From Swiss-Prot:
The gene is Ucn3. Disulfide bonds: none annotated. GO terms for molecular function: corticotropin-releasing hormone receptor 2 binding; neuropeptide hormone activity. It comes from Mus musculus (Mouse). Residues 1-23 form the signal peptide. Its main location: secreted. Residues 58-120 are annotated as: Disordered. This is Urocortin-3.
Length: 164
């Protein structure tokens, strides 16, 4: 059974999401994982077809092509800002327990519960980017509202000026 690759992401999100009391229980996971394996093998087959497309978009290198290793890994760890705990260490699949620190200490960062967790398996992504985008959208909306109010006030002032 061949599965299109665009079904892979929702399937991974469903299976790999953090577990809560309302999480889905899969008792017969054999077909699901066989679909995942098939989709991953298709992605690996199509990888060579995607390389010219990526090179046209002027990417410096593909991650699998650059064997430089440690320097690039250190740079990516420094560039990314949200904590994500991998499967190493923790309770169950992926150690999904987090605690929030105060915003003054570490703005928008999540830290795992366990202080003994492996630092090499964590990377961080920034929460500031979506916040900045939302702030920009709110500012645009405020500016539109202010322009509409200014136009209404100008119209009222013109009507008042005509009456005098």
């Amino acid at each position: 059974m061949l599965m299109p690759t665009y079904f892979l992401l929702p399937l991974l999100l469903l299976l790999g999401g953090p577990r809560t009391s309302l999480s889905h229980k899969f008792y017969n996971t054999g077909p699901v994982f066989s679909c995942l394996n098939t989709a991953l093998s298709e992605v690996k087959k199509n990888k060579l077809e995607d390389v010219p497309l990526l090179s046209k978009k002027s990417f410096g290198h593909l991650p699998t092509q650059d064997p430089s290793g440690e320097e690039d890994d250190n740079q990516t760890h420094l560039q990314i800002k949200r904590t994500f705990s991998g499967a190493a260490g923790g309770n169950g699949a992926g150690s999904t327990r987090y605690r929030y620190q105060s915003q003054a200490q570490h703005k928008g960062k999540l830290y795992p519960d366990k202080p003994k967790s492996d630092r090499g398996t964590k990377f961080t992504l920034s929460l500031d980017v979506p916040t900045n985008i939302m702030n920009i959208l709110f500012n645009i909306d405020k500016a539109k509202n202010l322009r509409a109010k200014a136009a209404a006030n100008a119209q009222l002032m013109a009507q008042i000026g005509k009456k005098k």
